[in-house]
Amino acid sequence: MVSQGSSPSLLEALSSDFLACKICLEQLRVPKTLPCLHTYCQDCLAQLAEGSRLRCPECRESVPVPPAGVAAFKTNFFVNGLLDLVKARAGGDLRAGKPACALCPLMGGASAGGPATARCLDCADDLCQACADGHRCTRQTHSHRVVDLVGYRAGWYDEEARERQAAQCPQHPGEALRFLCQPCSQLLCRECRLDPHLDHPCLPLAEAVRARRPGLEELLAGVDNNLAELEATRLAEKEALARLREQAAKVVTQVEEASERVLRALLAQKQEVLGQLRAHVEAAEEGARERLGELEGQEQVAREAAAFARRVLSLGREAEILSLEGAIAQRLRQLQGCPWVPGPAPCQLPQLELYPGLLDKNCHLLRLSFEEQLPQKDSGKDGARSQGGDATQPQSRDGVQTPNQEDGAKTPKESRAQTPQEDGGTQARVGSRSNKKRKFKGRLKSVSREPSPAPGPNLEGSGLLPRPIFFCSFPTRMPGDKRAPRITGLCPFGSREILVADEQNRALKRFSLNGDYRGAVPVPEGCSPCSVAALQDTVAFSAAARLYLINHNGEVQWRRALSLCQASHAVAAMPSGDRVAVSVSGHVEVYNMEGSLATRFIPGGKANRGLRALVFLTTSPQGHFVGSDWQQNSLVVCDGLGQVVGEYRGPGLHGCQPGSVSVDKKGYIFLTLREVNKVVILDPKGSLLGDFLTAYHGLEKPRVTTMVDGRYLVVSLSNGTIHVFRVRPLDS
């Protein structure tokens, strides 16, 4: 692209699409120029003309059509000259039909003329060698420039040919345009000069150009200035759009983090209230059990004494009754005087008090404001802004400055997301009216009236670890299910989709990450899928003691029998997607797409034969195998040859058996600890880094996990619910 200050070259004009019509995409024919300076073929413009108006196909400017039609639009002699040069260069082929001399037929020679070897740039004629040698021997042609025809066709003399080229008069063929009629602003040849323009003042073309060039150059300079301003404005508009997108991304992050922290606080309050309720009910049940035991004992004693007295009175003889009268009367008086409280003991019934503001549709925990930012044009102001801080920081309408991530009073995490329990007044800045802000403050303070004593999650090293962002949650039970789902396997299934192995309902269900049900992959009759992995257009799963490979229509490609020494067999797809690994009684077997055994190894080598039991298995993008070893009660990481890269069996497992494992795109390992409702994170070599998910995140008996697209951790719970968390990396 030619810059504003530089002049375009002739080569660029001839080689670019400048000479092509933007309508028919062919070389211009009878070029006509519109007032907007766009040039098209005359026939193409005639097809676009609608009545008295015509709209330019490029700039969409509407121009009036002259009464005489599109033929009356100004002829573009500049384009005509370039087209003549291009046609002259392209005329004839030196290898096929050689061009003939243009002078030989005029001098009475052969009718066709000899083969041309040269060209006169002034006459625009091809010449044979003889005519070329004598062409400059006359007074009229002495100054003509005769050049080699091959070099002319190659473009070596384009500049000279252009300088010596003369525009031809459209009214008088063969006559060059030589004059400019000043009153009519029309180009004239000698014949035109002698007819209607004889009395008009005319100037030679060179003199007319010298007179009019300064005015055009001045106008061009003004347009160049406008172009510079337009370019600066365009760049400023792009920068403003980039700032808008950047700020929008920040707001999205703030909304996600604020929502996450509010959800955490709400879940903590949920656990706290449920704990209090559980403790109250257990204490009440314990007291009730003690009272019921005492009452049942007293009731049994009284019932037995009363039954004995009734038998004596109804069946005994007079002497027998009188002999037992004293003992019976004493016992009955004793039972009547036994202390007991009629009616049930006082019981405190629990009642839930829900803050009414949360159900109010006008209660906005998140509120968005838009601040207009004036453009900065003064470079001095820009410099002051760069030295004195970020002056483009948005302010609210009442002049209060929005907190920045660089403020020293808060960490970046705290400055981006404020929960009601931390700072009830922080949210007040988003309102535009003071009474609304005070009302909103009061709502948030009411919510945070009593801080929750429930312990939060273990965030040891959280500033250095990937962080979870809650994405969505959905159930997996479908209307056709006969039993409650029991999810035993998960795997990614294409982009943003998961495949769920429901062993209880003997189904492989497809869900999007948003929880939309996408149907099911049919499984063979009687199969209950346990572990599942997706390969290239196929699905591998284990059921009982068999490994199956099926296509998406449920057709079995092959099946392999596995060892019966293991209750379940974990299945994992290799990163290449063309092999599947399965854990079989302490070792790992890898099968290719044809069902042939590609390799088999024991983690740690043959010395560990019989010492391993991999219940869960996955692979990393780096090609490593990661498994949960229930016999060693450890998490083991090994390479493709079975060499152990790392193994963890430390206190971070809390004495639990390691559960399901998943690996993100950077190699971080996510290990499920079902007994303590946790998912911990380990580095690619198996060293524990800290907790990733806890009951604080809503985990309740997590069963299996998988990683989708390397950044979404999908966790299934024992009740058939699936939670999806987005893994925020360190460099986010």
UniProtKB/Swiss-Prot annotation:
Q: Which Pfam families match?
A: zf-B_box, zf-RING_UBOX
List, as start-end ranges, the regions of compositional bias called Polar residues.
389-405
Q: Name one GO cellular component term.
A: cytoplasm
State what induces this protein: Up-regulated by IFN-alpha. Up-regulated in response to viral infection, including Sendai virus and bovine viral diarrhea virus.
| Gene symbol of the encoding locus | TRIM56
- Where in the chain are the B box-type zinc fingers? 164-205
Coiled-coil boundaries: 211-286
Q: What is this protein called?
A: E3 ubiquitin-protein ligase TRIM56
Per UniProt, the RING-type Zn-finger stretches lie at 21-60
Q: In which pathway does it act?
A: Protein modification; protein ubiquitination
